[in-house]
Amino acid sequence: MIQSSLYRALNKGFDYQILACKDFKESELAKEVISYFKPNIKAVLFPELRAKKNDDLRSFFEEFLQLLGGLREFYQALENKQETIIIAPISALLHPLPKKELLESFKITLLEKYNLKDLKDKLFYYGYEILDLVEVEGEASFRGDIVDIYIPNSKAYRLSFFDAECESIKELDPATQMSLKEDLLEIEIPPTLFSLDEPSYKDLKTKVEQSPLNSFSKDLTSFGLWFLGEKANDLLGVYQSIISPRALEEIQELASLNELDDERFKFLKVLENAQGYEDLEIHVHALEGFIALHSNRKITLLAPNKTILDNSISVLDAGNMECVIAPFVLNFKTPDRIFISLNSFERKKKRQKSKLALNELNAGEWVVHDDYGVGVFSQLIQHSVLGSKRDFLEIAYLGEDKLLLPVENLHLIARYVVQSDSVPVKDRLGKGSFLKLKAKVRAKLLEIAGKIIELAAERNLILGKKMDTHLAELEIFKSHAGFEYTSDQEKAIAEISRDLSSHRVMDRLLSGDVGFGKTEVAMHAIFCAFLNGFQSALVVPTTLLAHQHFETLKARFENFGVKVARLDRYIKTSEKSKLLKAVELGLVDVLIGTHAILGTKFKNLGLMVVDEEHKFGVKQKEALKELSKSVHFLSMSATPIPRTLNMALSQIKGISSLKTPPTDRKPSRTFLKEKNDELLKEIIYRELRRNGQIFYIHNHIASISKVKTKLEDLIPKLKIAILHSQINANESEEIMLEFAKGNYQVLLCTSIVESGIHLPNANTIIIDNAQNFGLADLHQLRGRVGRGKKEGFCYFLIEDQKSLNEQALKRLLALEKNSYLGSGESIAYHDLEIRGGGNLLGQDQSGHIKNIGYALYTRMLEDAIYELSGGKKRLEKSVEIQLGVSAFLNPELIASDSLRLDLYRRLSLCENVDEVGQIHEEIEDRFGKMDDLSAQFLQIITLKILANQLGILKLSNFNQNITLTYSDEKKESLKAPSKDDNDILETLLKHLHAQISLKRR
């Protein structure tokens, strides 16, 4: 009732500076009322901050930054004598917040002089994290005379200094690390946390460090807020405040759980509800009927544009109607007026770049070389070759063997990520065994790719059942989803509709993480088939998935007359024969089931949807192929497909990918804690209080029963199920089914349950001994919770903080602070590496993947598909550079090894000269003017690309004499003006460019 009550209060006289609401949704609705009816009042919206006193705020970092930004806006408006109000979820107002003096900003102005050391110190005391690379809010970096700053709740900027003078201020794109062209005159820099100087910073730091709080990072980011003392205010006590009835209920509930003392809220004025004032929820299809019923009141209809207005309603000229083109969301009625909005809230998605650098090469990690196999990357090292200095990667192989890989050939190696249950073994140099293994894998891949292409060609000749995909009922079906489709879902639906309405049978793969909306897309296709008079089959590998899909489809199709039935091992024999008869007679529209479906006779089957096809056995797959030969075929998979493989596969089948999480899905809240009994009880009770379920990951079968006993001692009557690899498949499925039904509260398992299973009620995951898991493992585990509308909680538990090395601690802290969802393909890709992804194409290849590594395997598979389908084959970049030229990215220009390594990798992957030019621009933008050694390395990369295009295998020189060796063993000689590095490179570049020009003619 927030909108109608607030509208009434505004009309009676309203002089409050804070409105406390139940949650963010209610706050958003309240802000719309104030912004529309009182545009002169500055309304500042706070986020939710569901942190309890003394919680580690790293887990709430993004919301905390937004809250501080909103508070600073409020203080500035007050200072400017502007009428202003904070509209906030009650959770953001429960704790004292910083006074104005702690949120002061400072300015940097073009052409003014600054001491860079003082600036660095100031940013540090203001809470900025000083790093090599600026990627997310609250970070800064100093590289010589170039300073990057990412201001919280704002943008990133790049400042260039010359002799202490600020020479340029430009906006920075953190995704590309490039600055934008336009120069700015000035920027204002607020604190990330608090505007402190050295003494006040040290004072607060001491208070935090001496506190008894349990955390891995006792710093100001984690706990500074709780120790501000007199420098913080209870906003509700200081400013005129009013609270919504639902916010008051929230406070009373928290008080009943002993989570806060409600005494201090009793003095607050409560926003009154009144008779005749009511918030509305009207569906667009019921709009005209509603308007006709209320002809006695003045109705204001708001819409984003005239087109939507005209398409939504035909009675715009009624005497009591007023139409307003405005973006506000207002839906309420009063005794004499009604406001209805055709607008919806736009969720501003931040373009988050994952801070979890999963593709980064780190010393000590396993790598696989295209020709020499599996080894360990030891270090980035400089060596003298032919009297010139060059950078190399040192890779350790079996025995004491070492390979020095020139950095321009970094494309020849990839990270070798093994599944958690296997131990990698180094290859031996010089035996040629790895090349033999590769040849074996290639032969198998050509066979697999051949079968796929043959099947695709066969299907392409079959005429499909053409369907009308533009029916009005499909739009009505979409509008009843109860949520907005993501752009990826819209695109996938359009692609499937195009297939269904063509004359060919559809063969499409729909891939996307669990909870990203694959089933909704499939249901749209099933409903389309139903409207066109066809039956559909949904085939799944497990009874649990059949049960889940049956419940989902039954509920979704309830109001649309679609008859849904299920066939699995739980259906009684007597019922089964009746069901099969009904399917044959066409009395069932959608049949859902396991492989039991495969022998079923349908009256008019038009669409077959298969979920997690790669989990079926060989015989079942053959039966699937037979049944689906002449019908539209949609395969769904939660296994992510790397982008390049996706491109190769799209030559032979349709591929749709869902990469965007639903708009209302939040990232899981992550906590890193030292394990103790009290903490375990608190975590479990917190989830049970909201009637949820818990995953408890304990990756050791031998001691899993002891963990169960301990949990039962801590919380008697706790219903716990155990699941691990030694329990047989049927029993495992039984346990999962019982857990999905809610008959267990905790699932105690060695690793997480199957990826394709959606368990929206399990929203807390506890990971025992988190230090023993890899980064991508942990991110994948965390992604298993928070998939419904409830927020997910993830706890990384460590037995003993002192036993952690610095690297492990850094890795875990990075995960705690960065909860971004689906942080790009790198997570999906590594997820696949961890899970094996062995039967991505329907035949188990996990043995081959284990031997040669996932990256090399997918690259070889792409090549096999291109080769057999007549596509463009990848150019091999195997030019050998034996030039006596010093060329490397100079550490004086780029001090960080990891940044240099990243640039080396990207340069080695360049396919054309333009890409090298772009990286050249980027280096100068990020690090300053390029020196000769660095520029010469980029020229070496350019030479490699040109030589590759001309079929040259080797470039070498002796003094000023240069030799070019071609693939047909032909040799060509050139003479440079001198043996200077510059002359050698210039002579070669000039000659190769001329050769390319001749070739193009």
Curated annotation (Swiss-Prot):
Domain Helicase ATP-binding: 499-658
SUPFAM superfamilies in the record: CarD-like, P-loop containing nucleoside triphosphate hydrolases, TRCF domain-like
Keyword Cell membrane belongs to the record: no
Limits of the Helicase C-terminal domain: 679-835
Location(s), subcellular: Cytoplasm
A Pfam entry, by short name: Helicase_C
InterPro entries named in the record: CarD-like/TRCF_RID, CarD-like/TRCF_RID_sf, DEAD/DEAH_box_helicase_dom, Helicase_ATP-bd, Helicase_C-like, Mfd, P-loop_NTPase, PriA_helicase
Renumbered ranges of motif DEEH box: 611-614
Gene3D superfamilies: 2.40.10.170, P-loop containing nucleotide triphosphate hydrolases, Penicillin-binding protein 1b domain, Transcription-repair-coupling factor, D7 domain
GO MF: 3'-5' DNA helicase activity; ATP binding; damaged DNA binding; hydrolase activity
Domain of life: Bacteria
UniProt keyword terms in alphabetical order: ATP-binding, Cytoplasm, DNA damage, DNA repair, DNA-binding, Helicase, Hydrolase, Nucleotide-binding
GO cellular component: cytoplasm
CDD domains assigned: DEXHc_TRCF (cd17991), SF2_C_TRCF (cd18810)
Biological processes per GO annotation: DNA recombination; DNA replication initiation; double-strand break repair; regulation of DNA-templated transcription; transcription-coupled nucleotide-excision repair, DNA damage recognition
The EC number(s) this enzyme carries: 3.6.4.-
Binding site for ATP: G512, D513, V514, G515, F516, G517, K518, T519
Record function comment: Couples transcription and DNA repair by recognizing RNA polymerase (RNAP) stalled at DNA lesions. Mediates ATP-dependent release of RNAP and its truncated transcript from the DNA, and recruitment of nucleotide excision repair machinery to the damaged site.
HAMAP family (alphabetical): TRCF
Entry similarity comment: In the N-terminal section; belongs to the UvrB family. In the C-terminal section; belongs to the helicase family. RecG subfamily.
Protein name: Transcription-repair-coupling factor
Organism of derivation: Helicobacter pylori (strain J99 / ATCC 700824) (Campylobacter pylori J99)
